[in-house]
Swiss-Prot record:
Name this protein carries in UniProt: Tail tube terminator protein
Cell location: Virion; Host cytoplasm
One biological process term in Gene Ontology: viral tail assembly
Organism from which the protein derives: Escherichia phage N15 (Bacteriophage N15)
UniProt superkingdom: Viruses
Family matches, as Gene3D superfamilies: Phage minor tail protein U (3.30.70.1700)
Major localization class: virion
Biological role: Plays an essential role in tail assembly by capping the rapidly polymerizing tail once it has reached its requisite length and serving as the interaction surface for the completion protein.
Subunit record text: Homohexamer. May bind to major tail protein and /or tape measure protein.
Family, per entry: Belongs to the lambda-like tail terminator protein family.
Family annotation (InterPro entries): GpU-like_sf, Phage_lambda_GpU-like, Phage_tail_protein-like_sf
Keyword Transmembrane set for record: no
Keyword terms of this UniProt record: Host cytoplasm, Late protein, Viral genome ejection through host cell envelope, Viral long flexible tail ejection system, Viral penetration into host cytoplasm, Viral release from host cell, Viral tail assembly, Viral tail protein, Virion, Virus entry into host cell
């Protein structure tokens, strides 16, 4: 399946660059525990058929690369993770060019665990298009 392949090549590239300093998730984790940090999740949302060309099977989705750290870390530590470890890897992901057509940065959001106060995250987002 194309979605699984997209996530896999990105996780492989991140794991190759970052190493075992992080736990990697194929999809957004439903639960994180104290020993799970730092964590990096790669997932897709809003995947839909574009309908731009007749007889084409072109899709678009939002690709998320979300870094999770302990709740008490400042946003600057999340920025450091994104800017020095994650973002540079995404400039050239081996094998990704054969899976997607375009990849455009959308920005990123900060989030906090409001329920358990265990984690904080930075969610880097890209708009991607691809043929199924």
């Amino acid at each position: 399946m194309k979605h699984r392949d997209i996530r896999k090549v990105i996780i492989d590239a991140l794991e190759s660059a970052i190493g075992t300093d992080a736990i990697y998730f194929d999809g957004r984790p439903a639960v994180l525990e104290e020993g799970d940090f730092p964590a990096v999740a790669v997932y897709l949302t809003d995947a839909e058929y574009t309908g731009e060309e007749l007889d084409a099977d072109t899709w678009q989705a939002i690709l998320h690369i979300e870094v999770f750290l302990e709740a008490q870390v400042p946003d600057s530590e999340l920025d450091d993770w994104m800017e020095t470890r994650v973002y540079p890897v995404l400039a050239e992901v081996p094998g990704l060019e054969s899976l997607i057509t375009t990849m455009v940065q959308q920005g990123y959001d900060y989030q906090r665990d409001d329920d358990m106060a265990l984690w904080s995250s930075a969610d880097l987002k890209y708009s991607i298009t691809y043929d199924m």
